[in-house]
């Protein structure tokens, strides 16, 4: 499958950027987040599950089983698909170089802040 716009995130700010892009700019083709089980092994400040975005917008959501995107399910998913551009909001971890290399135009990250400035 070919995904043009992909958003990475695990927080309410991630939901906000998905909503903004989807409603104001262009369709979001995929959201990559972590499964709730990952939060039991990692400190995730302000975690918010994003699987509801499938129902809200019809956007597929991939839930990784590793915050570092190294689990077999996620590696296979990334290997079997093509990606154009990524937006990272509220991920709280470095995205590995092998994942960055999968995106034709790169992944662009934003740091959260108080008050959603």
What residue ranges belong to the model's regions?
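One-carbon transfer enzymes
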Residues: 1-117
């Amino acid at each position: 499958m070919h995904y043009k716009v992909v958003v990475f995130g695990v927080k309410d700010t991630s939901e906000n950027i998905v909503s903004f892009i989807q409603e104001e700019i262009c369709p979001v083709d995929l959201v990559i987040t972590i499964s709730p089980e990952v939060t039991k092994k990692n400190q995730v400040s302000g975690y918010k599950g994003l699987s509801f975005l499938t129902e809200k917008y019809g956007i597929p959501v991939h839930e990784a089983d590793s915050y570092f995107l190294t689990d077999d399910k996620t590696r296979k998913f990334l290997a079997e698909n093509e990606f154009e551009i990524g937006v990272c909001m509220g991920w709280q971890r470095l995205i590995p170089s092998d994942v960055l290399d999968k995106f034709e135009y790169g992944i662009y990250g934003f740091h959260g802040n108080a008050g959603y400035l």
